[in-house]
């Protein structure tokens, strides 16, 4: 892939600024008409046309031609609504890379190892990776290839007395949930750290958007907090969930939030609450078996969200159509718990399972799993506690190590 990009760059450097005067009359049509004609071509036809001459190579590399193809491909940086999240990278290059995701072509490497079993969580931001280890959050810098790290962390965030269970990045802050029942607020670019008692038992999950923090705990409550520095620790709402709260997420509209609970004390593991009043708005689904706890939940848009957990399903919910029935679901073929999920905002779904460090890739337009990667052997079987991906790499955090699946240089 890197060689292809270098070849394209070298060719572009010597290409003429204008189209050739000789040749078929077709090439002398206005560019608008040529773009319209070429828009009917698929990936293979565009690639062959690019081999005709240097001018056509440049012309067929136009983002306008590749954008519809990219929107139908896996993990090209386009959301379902067409928003381009990676405008600085040529669309053609992203479509090339997408083929590796579709075909499962990648190379597995171990980025970090640790001596004792952990339950790590991680987040990505720009060229940095944030990883929880015991009661610390470590910040690592990626090397330029994105497939390796500087082994020494450039920042260490501390403050919890027990393990960090979960954390999120919120603009210039890290908000962490600890096994000590406390929430920690750390400024990324300074030494500012505050922690406060939030729950009677461990805080299993936390989210932060728009200056509001929500947290969920083993003590069967969810709470709403302000992020403002002068009001840290002042609880705005306490919600009795009647169940352990495993996961939590704030709606992009900042009007509500969803809790994923253990489904032991209450019949519904997915409930949506009003962020301003703390009142129940609705619950999602019906007929969940006891113990069908939701371990991960995420909003994809204000009206759509995904959930996964102990009942071995990933479910896609659209609040505009129904709150009682999901619009799509994907089942773990080996009846394993889903610990975590991540999407590209469009067609690609990645999940982490409870055994053998199993990462699965799914094309959301079909029910069957696209590819599966086992990152551990039987003696060291581990859940995938957290995974994140970019258009080039997928990172998976296991009990004893951090893996990267490199799709750029398979």
From Swiss-Prot:
It holds the Pfam family WD40. Residues 23-69 form the F-box domain. InterPro entries: F-box-like_dom_sf, F-box_dom, SCF_F-box/WD-repeat, WD40/YVTN_repeat-like_dom_sf, WD40_repeat_dom_sf, WD40_rpt. GO terms for biological process: cartilage development; embryonic digit morphogenesis; limb development; positive regulation of mesenchymal cell proliferation; Wnt signaling pathway. WD repeats lie at residues 159-196, 198-235, 289-327, 333-372. The keyword Repeat applies. Keywords: Developmental protein, Repeat, Ubl conjugation pathway, WD repeat, Wnt signaling pathway. Gene3D superfamilies: 1.20.1280.50, YVTN repeat-like/Quinoprotein amine dehydrogenase. The keyword Aminoacyl-tRNA synthetase does not apply. Part of a SCF (SKP1-cullin-F-box) protein ligase complex. Interacts with POUF51. Probably recognizes and binds to some phosphorylated proteins and promotes their ubiquitination and degradation. Likely to be involved in key signaling pathways crucial for normal limb development. May participate in Wnt signaling. This is F-box/WD repeat-containing protein 4. It comes from Mus musculus (Mouse). The gene is Fbxw4.
